[in-house]
A protein has these predicted regions:
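Compositionally biased, intrinsically disordered low-complexity regions enriched in proline and serine
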Residues: 7, 21, 79-80, 115
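Hydrophobic-ligand binding "helix-grip"
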Residues: 35-39, 44-102
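Short, charged low-complexity linear motifs
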Residues: 5-6, 17-18, 91-100, 124
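Hydrophobic ligand-binding cavity/cleft-lining segments
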Residues: 1-37
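Hydrophobic pocket/interface hotspot
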Residues: 19-20, 29, 57, 68, ...
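A conserved amphipathic terminal alpha-helix motif
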Residues: 97-125
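Short, intrinsically disordered, mixed-charge
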Residues: 21-31, 63, 114-121, 125
């Protein structure tokens, strides 16, 4: 069964440049996304409980977005952090795109909610 793309949006109170650092650097991602994060030659090594997963940076634009692809995933699947601004409130919005089996989207969304709460705590939100 193929996975489906789903999108989550979170309003955040910080500048896009600060948020981008937390989404695109080993030091920033290590604060909230994984226990340990290293990067070599555009490959990120994410560690949880002693095991590591590798993801390549597929595409990125400074202060706008970064897209990763797990090396074990099909080429068309990715996860992405995008930074946008609300036209009405001018508030920064974090948009997360990811793939999951249809039956797992709710659980995966809850996991992202938990991780983003940790990110917001680190950002002082």
């Amino acid at each position: 069964m193929s996975k489906q793309l789903y999108t989550l949006e979170f309003p955040v109170r910080c500048s896009p440049s600060i948020l981008y650092e937390f989404l695109s650097t080993p030091a920033g991602l290590g604060e909230w996304f994984a226990d340990k994060v290293d990067e070599r030659d555009n490959i990120f090594y994410f560690g949880w409980n002693g095991s590591f997963e590798k993801a390549e940076v597929v595409e990125n634009e400074q202060d706008k977005f970064i897209r990763f692809r797990w090396l074990t995933a099909p080429k068309e699947e990715y996860f992405e952090f995008r930074i946008d601004k609300s036209e009405i409130t001018n508030q920064t919005i974090l948009i997360i795109k990811d793939f999951a089996e249809k039956k797992d989207i709710k659980d995966q969304s809850m996991l992202w909610d938990y991780q983003v709460k940790d990110l917001f705590h680190r950002l002082g939100n």
